[in-house]
C-alpha cells in the first residue's frame, strides 16, 4: 500500500517520513493531485501558521483533492498543524477557513501562568478506546509544540486529551479521519508505538 505524505511547504517532513518508514509504511512525499488520488491513505503533517498552510494547500490545488478523497472513504491522519487544518476555522491569522472535515474551531491557548507556546511533555488522558492508542503504558507522555488548540466544546471527536490549564484535545478522530496535536515522531517509545498503530490503521 502507498501512503501519501502531503508536501505543502509546512515543515517537519523529514521527521515524519523517517517515523512513517520506521513504522513500516511505504510512503511517497507529494503535492501531485494524481499521486494523492492513487495513494491508499494520506498523512498531512505541518508546523507553522494556519493562514500560510491553507494558502499553500489552496495554491497547490490540494484542498478540494483532500476533501474529495476523504469523502470517498480514504483515511487521513493530520499531525500538529495538520490536525488543526482538519477543522472548520482557525483564529490564527484572522478567521481562516480550514478543511472542514471535523466540526470545531482552533483558538489561541489562554495566556496565564503557563507559557505559550505550549512546549514540552504532557500525559495523555484517554477519553475513549481507539486502536491507534492500543498497548500504550498507563501513563503515556507525548511531546507538544503549539500556540493554538481545538476547543473541546465538540467533544465527540476527542479520543485523548492533555491538561495545560485547559483541556487540549491531543488525539481526535471520526470515521476515516484522525488527528494528533502532539508530535508522535518526537515522542520517544510512546510515539513509536503510536506510529506503529497508526501504520496498521492507515493500511486497513
Locations of the language-model features?
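Short acidic low-complexity segments
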Residues: 27-38
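Structural motif
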Residues: 43-45
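Cysteine-nucleophile active-site neighborhood
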Residues: 48-121
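Pocket-forming structural segment of enzyme catalytic cores
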Residues: 88-164
